Design a protein with these regions (language model features):
Chain A
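N-terminal juxtamembrane cytosolic/stromal segments of multi-pass membrane proteins
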Residues: 1-53, 76
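Juxtamembrane boundary at the C-terminal end of a transmembrane helix
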Residues: 187-201
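Alpha-helical transmembrane segments and their helix-start/interface "positive-inside/aromatic belt" motifs
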Residues: 5-25, 88-99, 172-179
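Membrane-helix interface motif
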Residues: 34-44, 109-122, 195-198
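Hydrophobic alpha-helical transmembrane segments and adjacent short intramembrane/lumenal linkers
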Residues: 89-178, 184, 188
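Hydrophobic, aromatic-rich alpha-helical transmembrane segments
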Residues: 15-19, 47, 51-59, 63, ...
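Alpha-helical transmembrane segments with an aromatic anchor "belt"
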Residues: 49-123
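Alpha-helical transmembrane spans of integral membrane proteins, capturing the lipid-embedded, hydrophobic core
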Residues: 22-30, 58-71, 94-98, 102, ...
Length: 201, 93
């Protein structure tokens, strides 16, 4: 596979095919997240919350972080593009763009993140100077955090290409509308997820 | 090797005109100043795209399948081509 395809598979896959694979991606991410306690509190964030919540919550969360941005980017594409924009292209490519977060959900299985979080909480919030953590956990937690940062960059690049290809927007117009859409989507998905968490937790 | 028809001047980048036409069978040469047809002012890839489009009976879905590209990618190529043709037509006026 060419490296460019990792960031832009949409030149070859879009529409209903992308939507189908996107749903598979969301199912796998939701299911893996359920077992690894990995949450996606907004469109791009990854959070580890070791608290039992039903499987349906994880699936609904996946739908929320896909549906809201897709809707926002579809409206922006209609506003900015002179081409005919198909709903299935925006929603399909946006769903498929979420595939890097399968890895994020798998990374949630690393117990080091939890232990590192507990250590920081004890040290800075509870001022417990007796709190300890192994060097292995610190190194693993830092590596996992770095990987998650890379996954976020990968996701944003994929979403930008999904938006650009589906709407036939170029240059500054594409970048400007994408940044605006991204910003609104993050806030909207975050607010809906807070409400969702309140319903389930 | 198939020669490529130059459409831009290598010296200044301006549009080229046809100055003479030659008949291979009777060796007649016609001189004058003829502008290139719009189709020939397009690049090779764009000409190939138009040919493919016609051969696919204007179906972008069929074209996407044969080119192994997604539908929006092919539609974007067509939109860009329409824009270029409009631009060339405006320049000709």
């Amino acid at each position: 596979m060419k490296p460019s395809k990792l960031f832009n598979p949409f030149e070859e896959i879009a529409g209903a095919k992308a939507l189908f694979f996107g749903f598979v991606v969301m199912l796998i991410t939701g299911l893996t997240g359920y077992f690894s306690f990995t949450h996606f509190p907004d469109m791009i964030s990854i959070k580890y919350i070791p608290e039992y919540l039903p499987l349906s919550y994880y699936f609904v969360q996946q739908v929320v972080i896909w549906l809201i941005p897709s809707l926002i980017f579809y409206v922006f594409a209609l506003i900015g593009s002179s081409s005919s924009v198909r709903v299935v292209d925006i929603f399909g490519t946006m769903a498929l763009a979420r595939f890097p977060y399968i890895i994020a959900a798998v990374l949630g299985f690393s117990g080091s993140m939890k232990r590192f979080g507990d250590y920081l909480m004890a040290l800075f919030m509870e001022h417990d100077t007796t709190a300890t953590i192994s060097t292995f956990d610190i190194v693993t937690a830092i590596v996992v955090m770095f990987l998650m940062l890379l996954l976020t960059v990968w996701l944003v690049a994929l979403m930008y290409n999904a938006f650009r290809i589906s709407s036939n927007l170029k240059g500054g117009k594409a970048v400007g509308l994408f940044i605006a859409g991204l910003f609104i989507s993050i806030i909207a998905t975050m607010l809906v997820n807070i409400w969702l968490y309140g319903l389930w937790a | 090797m198939e020669k490529k028809l130059p459409i831009m001047c290598p010296g200044c980048g301006g549009s080229l005109m046809v100055k003479s036409l030659y008949c291979e069978s009777c060796e007649t040469t016609i001189s004058g100043s003829f502008s290139l047809p719009l189709f020939l002012k397009l690049g090779q890839k764009e000409q190939d795209f138009i040919m493919e489009f016609v051969q696919s009976s204007g179906s972008l879905k069929q074209m996407a399948k044969s080119l192994k590209l997604s539908y929006p990618t092919v539609r974007n190529m067509l939109d860009d081509l329409i824009e270029k043709i409009t631009q060339l037509k405006t320049e000709d006026l």
